[in-house]
């Protein structure tokens, strides 16, 4: 059985996220084709949640 310890971390060398062409962040998932930051590829609207800012601001 393989663990998730220190020796396994050395195998993590593949690029998962690349630069998003809508927001410019390095959050666009190559396989899923969705941006984790702005929601590009999933929604025409920008990804935005109320918990991202203080209430009333």
Curated annotation (Swiss-Prot):
- Keyword check for Thylakoid, yes or no: no
Whether RNA-binding counts among this entry's keywords is yes
Which GO biological process annotations does it have? translation
What GO molecular function annotations does the UniProt record carry, in alphabetical order?
Answer: rRNA binding; structural constituent of ribosome; zinc ion binding
One cellular component (GO) term of this entry: cytosolic large ribosomal subunit
* C4-type ZnF: 20-38
Keywords (alphabetical) are:
Metal-binding, Ribonucleoprotein, Ribosomal protein, RNA-binding, rRNA-binding, Zinc, Zinc-finger
Task: Explain how, and how many, cofactor molecules are bound.
Answer: Binds 1 zinc ion per subunit.
Tell me its cofactors. Answer: Zn(2+)
Residue ranges of the TM segments: none
Provide the binding site for Zn(2+).
Answer: 20, 23, 35, 38
The record ties this protein, via Pfam families, to: Ribosomal_L37e
Question: InterPro entries from the entry?
Answer: Ribosomal_eL37, Ribosomal_eL37/eL43, Ribosomal_eL37_CS, Ribosomal_zn-bd
What role is this protein assigned? Binds to the 23S rRNA.
User: What family does this chain come from, according to its entry?
Assistant: Belongs to the eukaryotic ribosomal protein eL37 family.
Q: Know the name of this protein?
A: Large ribosomal subunit protein eL37
Source species, please?
A: Natronomonas pharaonis (strain ATCC 35678 / DSM 2160 / CIP 103997 / JCM 8858 / NBRC 14720 / NCIMB 2260 / Gabara) (Halobacterium pharaonis)
Question: What gene, per UniProt, encodes this protein?
Answer: rpl37e
């Amino acid at each position: 059985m393989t663990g998730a310890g220190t020796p396994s971390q050395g195998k993590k060398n593949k690029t998962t996220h690349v630069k998003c062409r809508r927001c410019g962040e390095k959050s666009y998932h190559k396989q899923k084709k969705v941006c984790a930051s702005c929601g590009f590829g999933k929604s025409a609207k920008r990804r935005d949640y109320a918990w991202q800012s203080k209430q009333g601001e």
